[in-house]
Each structure stands twice: as structure tokens, then as C-alpha cells.
């Protein structure tokens, strides 16, 4: 899907050699999420993350600009419009270019939240002002400034002033949905007029990007099956939302996983349904399981043959 740099940058996050569920180091040993960001940067040919303050200039865009400056949204969309013209030889519809731009923002940025949860059982509590990105033709670079985080009671850093302790795994998953949803909500509002979709479809688009991002990272880590299982649990429909009862935490009675679309979309492939897997959507994995996307990226409007294998137009007929 989107791209990024494999270089960790001038101030790389410290590496970690422990397993996926090993406890995170003591608070003085690392920045929250840093070990996960370092592992992703080392493994991914398209995405690089460095722990640093937000940057501006030289192609860098502070994420906060997307809600503070409408022209920043237009700049990102123009980038995808140019890429679409180069790839397909014809212009993208403006709303399609906007949808691509939104997906290619949410896809990498969501990993700043989901990957530390997956690898360290820590959820960084990030604001738009903590992140910046630089997109190139085939790569995306991110800077992130982690401060507070949510963790489990057994985390060695749970007593840190930075930490907010969740009671159990279910509560930590709720913290993740809350933190990521709160980060994305103003971004979806900023893109909405350009994408020309209502809130329900915008959140479906965001859900697809979140799922596809961590599923991609799980593949790099050799843990795609676990990523699929944990995403399915994270977005399982019908469970009551956890209300941690702390300032800044979600106390919303809406059914989990609001505001995200319920269900990660993983299911055995239906017989007789085709569709070519592309970089915009997760198609079939090594175990023969298809993922049905919650939204359509509308690529067929510019290239009818270039349709995701998991497109709801293919999977849900």
C-alpha cells in the first residue's frame, strides 16, 4: 500500500530482542512504543518511524496541520492525484483521490498505536501534535513523540507517571480503540468534504486502513495469524465498551468497537468469488483466508480491472 523509508533516522529508537509478548523495559530504558517502531523500521521496505518532535519543511507535514489548515488536506490529496495520473494515465475523480489520500494517511499512522499494543501491550496516547509524516512516491516516513501510554498491571513501567494502567486485556483493547479513535476523528472530519462520504463510511475506510496496516506488519514479523486473531478480537461486534473512568479515557456506552466498523472482515473465501488482490486492500493470506473490506476504495472508477480481492463489491454480493 503506502510506502516509506527503511532508515530509522538520525535518532533511532532503541532495538529490543525480546518476544512479541515480553514485558516492555522499565520506564527509564525506552520511550513508549520505541522498540516496536524500531522493529517496524528495520523490517519494512515502505515505512520508517523515528522518535522525534514533529517536523515541517522538506516535504514533512505535521499531522496537526490537517485540522488547522484546510490547504494541508488539499496538498495530500494533490499528491495522490499526481500518483494516480502517473499510474493510470488518466486523472482520478477528486473524491477518489481524496479517499486514497485518507487511506494512505491512516494506514501508516494507525501503526503508531496498534503495533506497540501488539508487540509490547502498550498503547501510546498520542495527539495530532505528536506526529508528522513525509510521503514520497513509494515510501512514508513518520516522526512520533510518545509521552503517556496505557499498559497492563504487570508492565514494569506501570508505576511511571507516564503510565495509565488498564485492568486487563479487554480494558487495554478499549484504551487502544479510544486513543486511536480520538486521534483519527478530527482527521476524518477534515477529509470528509473532499472524500464526499458520511461519517459511517469514513469510519469504515479508517477501519480498513487500521486492519490492513497491522496485518501487513504481522506478516513482516512472521505473526500474521496472530495479527488476524487479535484484530478480530479488537473489532469484535456486540461487546459493551469499557469505561475506564479516568480523565481522558473513553467512558462511552456505545457497543464496541465504536466508532470503528464492527468486525475485522476475516472469513473463509466464498466459492466462486474472484477479484485480484492489490496493494490497496488485503486479499488472500498464506492460510487461504480472505478479508472482506468494510469500504470500497473506488479504484474501479479509473481502472475497472484493478479491483481489490476483498472489495465489498466482490465479497458481499
Please give the residue ranges for each predicted region.
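Hydrophobic, aromatic-lined core segments that form the binding pocket/scaffold
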Residues: 65, 70-285
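Local cysteine-cluster metal-coordination motifs and their immediate loop/turn environment
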Residues: 293-316
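Generic N-terminal leader/targeting and pre-domain segments
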Residues: 1-100
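Short amphipathic alpha-helical segments
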Residues: 1-7, 310-317
Amino acid at each position: 500500500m503506502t510506502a516509506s523509508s527503511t532508515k530509522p533516522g538520525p535518532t533511532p529508537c532503541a532495538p529490543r530482542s525480546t518476544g512479541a509478548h515480553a514485558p516492555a523495559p522499565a520506564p527509564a530504558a525506552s520511550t513508549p512504543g520505541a522498540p516496536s517502531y524500531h522493529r517496524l523500521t528495520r523490517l519494512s521496505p515502505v515505512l520508517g518511524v523515528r522518535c522525534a518532535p514533529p517536523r515541517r519543511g522538506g516535504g514533512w507535514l505535521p499531522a496537526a496541520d490537517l485540522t488547522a489548515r484546510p490547504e494541508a488536506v488539499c496538498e495530500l490529496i494533490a499528491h495522490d492525484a499526481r500518483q494516480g495520473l502517473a499510474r493510470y494515465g488518466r486523472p482520478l475523480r477528486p473524491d477518489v483521490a481524496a479517499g486514497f489520500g485518507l487511506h494512505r494517511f491512516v494506514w501508516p499512522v494507525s501503526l503508531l498505536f496498534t503495533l506497540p499494543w501488539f508487540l509490547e501491550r502498550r498503547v501510546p496516547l498520542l495527539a495530532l501534535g505528536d506526529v508528522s509524516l513525509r510521503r514520497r512516491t513509494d515510501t512514508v516516513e513518520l516522526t512520533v513523540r510518545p509521552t503517556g501510554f496505557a499498559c497492563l498491571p504487570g508492565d514494569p513501567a506501570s508505576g511511571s507517571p507516564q503510565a495509565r494502567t488498564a485492568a486487563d486485556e479487554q480494558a487495554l483493547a478499549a484504551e487502544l480503540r479510544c486513543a486511536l479513535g480520538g486521534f483519527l476523528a478530527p482527521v476524518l472530519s477534515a477529509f470528509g468534504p473532499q472524500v464526499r462520504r458520511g461519517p459511517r463510511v469514513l469510519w469504515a475506510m479508517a477501519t480498513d486502513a487500521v486492519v490492513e496496516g497491522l496485518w501487513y506488519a504481522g506478516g513482516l514479523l512472521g505473526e500474521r495469524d496472530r495479527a488476524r486473531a487479535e484484530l478480530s478480537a479488537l473489532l469484535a461486534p456486540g461487546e459493551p465498551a469499557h469505561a475506564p473512568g479516568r480523565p481522558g479515557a473513553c467512558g462511552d456506552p456505545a457497543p464496541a468497537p465504536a466508532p470503528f466498523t464492527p468486525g475485522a472482515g476475516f472469513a473463509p473465501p466464498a466459492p466462486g468469488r474472484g477479484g485480484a488482490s492489490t496493494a490497496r486492500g488485503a486479499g488472500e493470506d498464506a492460510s487461504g483466508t480472505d478479508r472482506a473490506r468494510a469500504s470500497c476504495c473506488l479504484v474501479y472508477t479509473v481502472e475497472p480491472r484493478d479491483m481489490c480481492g476483498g472489495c465489498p463489491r466482490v465479497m458481499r454480493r
